[in-house]
């Protein structure tokens, strides 16, 4: 995991792609360093496949991108702490990309605390194929 000037870069592998609850929507599940990330993507723009290696970028600054990347911007909506006995101290951070959701699960520590982010911060989120 790299972090430079509020740009977070995570190396990830796509574990699965499943149908979402809404028509033409899929949910991509990734393992990224110490985090698991799930995000909604519209089927017509899904460029990813299972077991693919990608990088996830989260930044307060606009990121450069190409047609081979999935990028959006939105707001950190909330972070919940799940202290149930099954999960230990698990944190779930939700980002809304104006309707599409990104869910970041940390089993150790608050994602927001680690990266000095706050609820309602405007952020950019990109998933880019490894080149």
Curated annotation (Swiss-Prot):
The listed locations are: Cytoplasm
Q: Does the entry feature the keyword Cytoplasm, yes or no? A: yes
What keywords are annotated for this sequence in UniProt?
A: Cytoplasm, DNA-directed RNA polymerase, Nucleotidyltransferase, Transcription, Transferase
Gene3D superfamilies xref list: Nucleic acid-binding proteins
Q: Which reaction does it catalyse?
A: RNA(n) + a ribonucleoside 5'-triphosphate = RNA(n+1) + diphosphate
Lineage top rank: taxon: Archaea
InterPro entries from the UniProt entry: NA-bd_OB-fold, RNA_pol_Rpo8
Give the UniProt entry's GO cellular component terms.
cytoplasm; DNA-directed RNA polymerase complex
Q: What are this entry's molecular-function GO terms? A: DNA-directed RNA polymerase activity
- EC number(s) for this protein? 2.7.7.6
Biological process (GO) annotations?
A: DNA-templated transcription
The record ties this protein, via Pfam families, to: RNA_pol_RpbG (PF16992)
Q: How does it assemble?
A: Part of the 13-subunit RNA polymerase complex. Interacts with Rpo1N on the periphery of the clamp head.
Q: What this chain does, per the record?
A: DNA-dependent RNA polymerase (RNAP) catalyzes the transcription of DNA into RNA using the four ribonucleoside triphosphates as substrates.
Q: Which NCBIfam families match?
A: PRK14980.1
Q: Which family does it belong to?
A: Belongs to the archaeal Rpo8 RNA polymerase subunit family.
Q: What is this protein called?
A: DNA-directed RNA polymerase subunit Rpo8
Please tell me the species this chain comes from. Answer: Saccharolobus shibatae (strain ATCC 51178 / DSM 5389 / JCM 8931 / NBRC 15437 / B12)
